[in-house]
Amino acid sequence: MIIFSVPVILSGILQLLFNACDIIVVGNFAGDASLAAVGSTSSLINLFTNLFIGLSVGSNVLIAHFVGSNDKSKVSLTVHTSIVLAIICGVFLSVAGFIFANPILKLMGSPDDVIMLATLYLKIYFLGMPALLIYNFGAAILRAVGNTKHPLYFLTISGVLNILLNLLLVICFSMGVAGVAIATVVSEYLSAALIIWYLSEKSEELKLTRSDLKIDPYILKRVIAIGIPAGLQGTIFSLSNVVIQSAINSFGSDVVAGNSATMNIEGFVYMAMNAIYQTAITFVGQNYGAGKKKRVLRCTLQAEAIVVIVGLFFGVSAYIFSTELLHIYSGSPAVVAAGKIRCAYILPIYFLCGSMDVMVGALRGIGQSVVPMVTSLIGACALRLVWISTVFKMHRTTGMLYISYPISWIITLIAHIAFFVYFYNKIPKEKE
C-alpha cells in the first residue's frame, strides 16, 4: 500500500508545487491584488470541477472491481466510456465557466480591486477544462490497476512546462494573471495528450482505441451511480468553502491574499493525505471485487494509520515553518499575519480531514457512495453554513470562521466510521 501511495503522494505534491509557483510568481511579480485574484478563485474552480472530477472516482472503483473479478471486457468498456464522458463534461464546464465567472464572483462579494483580474483568470482557466478532466479520468483509470508511476511522469513533464511558461509570460512579457492562466491551460493539455498517448500506445490491459470510443449505457449508469455522489460530496464541500470565501472577502484584500497563500500551503498537506484516500479506494475496491472481506478491513485500517502519520508530519511541519513559507508568497506583513491565523487553526490538526477522507474512500471501495455524500452534506456543508450564520455572525473574526473546519471534520469522521462498520458487517461471509 505504501509503495502504491508514494507516486500518488509525489503527484499531488508536484501538482501543488506547480500551483504554488503560479501564486509565488504572481505574488512577487504582479502584486498582491493579482495574488488575491488568483487565490480567491480556487474555491469557485473547485465548486465547478469537483462534481465532474468525482465521476472519475466512479471509473476508478468500477475498474478496480472488474480487475478484482478478472472481467477484462468490462474493464475495456469502462475505459472508453470514461474518456468520452471526460470530454463531454470538460466542454460543458468550459462553456459554463466562461459565461458565469463574473456573475458568480460578484455574488461572492469579491473586492473591487480583485474582481476584474479574477474574472480574466477564470475565463482563461476554464478553457482547459476538457484537458483537466481527461487527465483526471486517465489517472484514475491507471490507478485502478495499480499504475501510479505514469501519471506522476506526465504531471512532472507538464508541470515543468507550466513553470517555464509562468516565468516567460509573467516576468518577461508582464502578462500577470492572464499569463499564469495561459501557462496552466497549455500544461494541462500536454498532460492530457500524454495520458491519452499512453493508454492508446503503451497500455495492454487498458488499451484505448478510437473505434471503441463510445458510451456504454450500462457502464455509464454504474459510473454515475458511484461517481455522482462522490462528485456531489466534493461540490458540497466546495459550496461551503465558497460561502466561507465570501465571508473572508469581507475582511479586505490583505486577508484574502493571506488566506489564499495559506490555502496553497495546506494543499501540500492535503495532497499527501489525498493520495492515501485514493489508495484506499483502489485497494478496498479490488479486494471487495475479489470477495476478500478481511483484506477490506485490513486495507482500511492500514490506510487510516498511514494518513494520520502523514497528516501529522506534514501539517505540524508546515505550521512550525508557516512564517517562512508565507514570506515566499508575499512580502507584505499584513498578508503574512492574516495567513498565520489560518495556519494556526488548520495545519496542526489537518490529519482529521485526511482520516475523514480515508473512511470515505473505504465506503466507496465497497460500493457505498450515497451515504458518505449525505453524511458530508449534513456534517460539512450544513454545519458550516449554520456556524457562519450564527456563531460567526455574533463574533466576526477570521479565527471564529476557520474553527468551523475542524469541528465539521470531527463530526463527519465519527459518522463515516459508524457507517463503515455497519456496511462492512453486511458484506456476506462467503466472500471471505
What is the predicted function of each stretch?
Residues 30-43, 118, 122, 181, ...:
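Small-residue hotspots at the loop-to-helix junctions and early N-terminal turns
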Residues 17-36, 105-112, 168-175, 235-268, ...:
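Helix-terminus/linker motif at the lipid-water interface of multi-pass membrane proteins
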Residues 3-22, 124, 135, 158, ...:
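Transmembrane helical elements of multi-pass membrane transporters/channels
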Residues 35-95, 132-151, 245, 258-322, ...:
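Small-residue-rich hydrophobic transmembrane alpha-helices
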Residues 1-5, 63-128, 172-228, 284-349, ...:
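Short alpha-helical transmembrane segments in multi-pass integral membrane proteins
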Residues 1-29, 43-58, 62, 87-94, ...:
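N-terminal transmembrane alpha-helices
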Residues 56, 125-143, 151-159, 180-193, ...:
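Short runs within selected transmembrane alpha-helices of multi-pass transporters and secretion channels
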Residues 47-50, 162-166, 192-196, 268-271, ...:
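Hydrophobic transmembrane alpha-helices of multi-pass small-molecule transporters
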